[in-house]
Amino acid sequence: MTHIIIDGDACPVVDSIIDLTTETGIFVTIIRSFSHFSNQLYPPHVSTLYVDDGPDAVDYKIVQLSTKDDIVITQDYGLASLLVDKVLIVMHHNGKIYNSKNIQQLLDKRYMNAQIRKQGGRHKGPPPFTKQDQKVFEQSLLKVIHRIKELD
């Protein structure tokens, strides 16, 4: 059964995912570090799992828990590269789907930007997340959900 796992420490689309899955029967797990603890109550199909505040602790837990039927939402290219051949779909919060063709290019860009920073240089970061970005993500996730439901 399909399940959505969210890399929840910095995900701007958690509420959208919850809203879109409320009627679908798809369970959602938000994985966060304790430094991002929240008392927010979620619907019954949503669970929150907290892990220690170590570097990449959330990523390790996601890799451990994910299965071939899962959809993982993350903006972490490193985590996405570990999951792209393991899970059903890995998706960025901008709606783009990571795959074996685009992940290496994204990792290379991340590496080049790290080298620029290491040498004291600067590079342009991502633009602010907008309502339009949220709508694009929602449309992309809905397409994925409909495709999965058709296969079930």
UniProtKB/Swiss-Prot annotation:
Pfam families with a match to the protein in the record: DUF188
Tree of life domain: Bacteria
InterPro entries linked: UPF0178 (IPR003791)
Protein family: Belongs to the UPF0178 family.
PANTHER family cross-referenced by the UniProt entry: UPF0178 PROTEIN YAII
Designated name of the protein: UPF0178 protein SAB0630c
